[in-house]
Amino acid sequence: MGTRPTDEQYGAVCFACRCYEAECVAVRLLARSETSAQQLGFKLLKRGFEKRVVESVFPVLKRYSWLDDTRFARAWLRNRVDSRPASRAQLLGELKRRGVSHADAEGALDLLFQEQDEETLCLRLLEKLRRRGYGPHTLQRALQRRQFSPSLVRRCLAVETEGA
């Protein structure tokens, strides 16, 4: 008969099994939808995985490009801007709250704003709010709350008024 594993060896095997289990759960979650590393970490912790297990899984997921905050930021921005236009400043804040680094968020925003400018987003939101029955003063406040600059808001309101 062989020798029994030491407590240290047994602990290492248990840790490796737990990491494999966390990796499988993470891949299933990522297959459903793109997510940031921070969001994935929260989901894994919520499912009962220890922090050190979660942290050891991230390098594997990144090495195989299953977890990529830059890709998440780009996908999230496309979806977010299509459904709810917002200013660059607001989008940056929302990406950072989702755990995307400032550099990754800025890079994704630069790409987005190469395709469409902030004025276009402001005008789209203005049109959407106008259809909901917002009046001129309410429109101005709503656009400024979404962190469009006061000068851009005035310009968009003027363009929208000319077109009406």
From Swiss-Prot:
One of its GO terms (cellular component) is cytoplasm. Its main location: cytoplasm. It is found in: Cytoplasm. Coiled coil: none annotated. GO terms for biological process: regulation of DNA repair. Keywords: Cytoplasm. Pfam families: RecX_HTH2 (PF02631). Belongs to the RecX family. Modulates RecA activity. NCBIfam families: PRK00117.5-2. This is Regulatory protein RecX. The gene is recX.
